[in-house]
Amino acid sequence: APYLPNPDCYLPDQGGYHDDSLDIRVETSYWTQDIERVDEPGEGTTTVMAVYVKITDPTQIRTALAFPYPSKNTVRVERMAKQNNAVLAINGDYFIYHSEGIVYRNTHRLRELPREYRDTMIIDTEGGMHIIQGTTHQKWQDYLENGGTVAHTFCFGPGLVIDGVVRDEFDSRMDNGPKTPAQRMIFGQITPMEFVILCTEGPESQSPKSIGFDLWGAAKLAGAFGLQNAYNLDGGSSCTVVLNNEKINSPSNPKRR
């Protein structure tokens, strides 16, 4: 049976959730462009919402589509969260707006068109996270032939931290606003079954104001949080974090997905 949220297990002040199978903790912090943590927001800082997620069963990570593939119709994340009985939900990947990359959702293959300038993030069936940098057909086959399993894959990218190494070079053929300080949705892992989502605010946020991070800043930030693997899952101004069917990030930014 799927795990269902217990309404009594949400923490006060949108602080997270805790039951026997799931632990979620939400923390807000403020960072400079040099990736130094400061006590309060101010000139030149960026607000970062960190969501720590610890699961006990790999099937607790689920993906959902707004409409059946390949429809481009959209649904707000809050509604999708409610439809899918999600304690926590985030948006990302944007894969429907191009025709490349490897896309699996809940073990079902939707697309398998590897491109060497796209990094692939994999959540395996054991709750582990892997990133294939520059996903050629051969690298994808190698992963599968070496016993790699697939529950979900994502192709927005790029990888920011791979096996503990913070990236400092990114493929210029990818149009993910590499040099633009922006809102970023970073999905990362510390150990299997233990994930961290970093939602950084961008220039659209007014209260408090934020600058946002370019890809290099996002990678350094992920490293500062101790992530072993981290992936740029979304960005721009549409990053949405939903807890208990309510959007909890960037309250002063009206945009949402």
Task: State where each predicted segment sits.
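Gly/Ser/Thr/Pro-rich low-complexity, intrinsically disordered segments
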Residues: 1-257
